[in-house]
């Protein structure tokens, strides 16, 4: 289903660029995704139930997503027709990836032993921006007591580990190799 999700996301992304509504589309799709996530199991059951014909699924889209822009709603209708409403979170994740790529930004998770101040997060963010070449990072601070000290940052698929836990693990590996 990941390939299908990427195709929907790509089509919506290209339409958003063509119609110059990328930011609006992202905001509305994020709101739709936020509404769908707690009801994902119900949506999956409804979507896969053979008793629910396409008209029923389209009625659900019409009533549940009033007020969203026509391009997003049209994609939801196509997804309903093809019984793909259950992959909506995957489609949003793929769309979000394209959106972030367009703006040269990404999400970063910064793990630390204690909560970092905004000033500390800004400094870490600046260092990560220099190392990754991105224009912007959306940073989330997560407390992880197992790090002992230091920080570990994840940006996309890259991990920057400056934790004491990592230092100790590297020392341990060196000892094992020299035995």
UniProtKB/Swiss-Prot annotation:
Q: Which UniProt keywords apply?
A: ATP synthesis, Cell membrane, CF(1), Hydrogen ion transport, Ion transport, Membrane, Transport
Q: Name one GO molecular function term.
A: proton-transporting ATP synthase activity, rotational mechanism
**This protein's record includes keyword Cell division:** no
- Keyword Ion transport appears in the UniProt entry: yes
UniProt-annotated location(s) = Cell membrane
Going by the entry's taxonomy, the superkingdom of the source organism is recorded as Bacteria
Q: GO cellular-component terms in the record?
A: plasma membrane; proton-transporting ATP synthase complex
* Recorded topology in the membrane: Peripheral membrane protein
Q: Subunit structure of this entry? A: F-type ATPases have 2 components, F(1) - the catalytic core - and F(0) - the membrane proton channel. F(1) has five subunits: alpha(3), beta(3), gamma(1), delta(1), epsilon(1). F(0) has three main subunits: a(1), b(2) and c(10-14). The alpha and beta chains form an alternating ring which encloses part of the gamma chain. F(1) is attached to F(0) by a central stalk formed by the gamma and epsilon chains, while a peripheral stalk is formed by the delta and b chains.
The family database entries (HAMAP family) matched by this protein are listed as: ATP_synth_delta_bact (MF_01416)
Known role: F(1)F(0) ATP synthase produces ATP from ADP in the presence of a proton or sodium gradient. F-type ATPases consist of two structural domains, F(1) containing the extramembraneous catalytic core and F(0) containing the membrane proton channel, linked together by a central stalk and a peripheral stalk. During catalysis, ATP synthesis in the catalytic domain of F(1) is coupled via a rotary mechanism of the central stalk subunits to proton translocation.
UniProt family annotation: Belongs to the ATPase delta chain family.
- What name does the UniProt record give this protein? ATP synthase subunit delta
Q: Which organism is it from?
A: Staphylococcus carnosus (strain TM300)
């Amino acid at each position: 289903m990941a390939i299908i999700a990427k195709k929907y996301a790509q089509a919506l992304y290209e339409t958003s660029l063509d119609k110059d509504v990328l930011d609006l589309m992202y905001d509305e799709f994020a709101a739709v995704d936020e509404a769908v996530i707690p009801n994902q199991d119900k949506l999956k059951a409804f979507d896969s139930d053979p008793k629910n014909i396409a008209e029923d699924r389209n009625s659900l889209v019409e009533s549940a997503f009033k007020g969203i822009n026509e391009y997003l709603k049209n994609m939801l209708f196509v997804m309903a027709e093809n019984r793909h409403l259950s992959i909506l979170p995957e489609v949003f994740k793929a769309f979000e990836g394209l959106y972030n790529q367009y703006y040269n930004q990404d999400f970063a998770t910064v793990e630390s032993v204690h909560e970092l101040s905004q000033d500390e997060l800004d400094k870490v963010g600046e260092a990560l921006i220099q190392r990754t070449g991105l224009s912007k990072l959306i940073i989330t601070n997560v407390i992880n007591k197992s790090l002992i000290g230091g920080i570990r940052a994840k940006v996309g698929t890259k991990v920057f580990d400056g934790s004491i836990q990592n230092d100790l693990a590297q020392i341990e590996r060196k000892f094992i190799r020299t035995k």
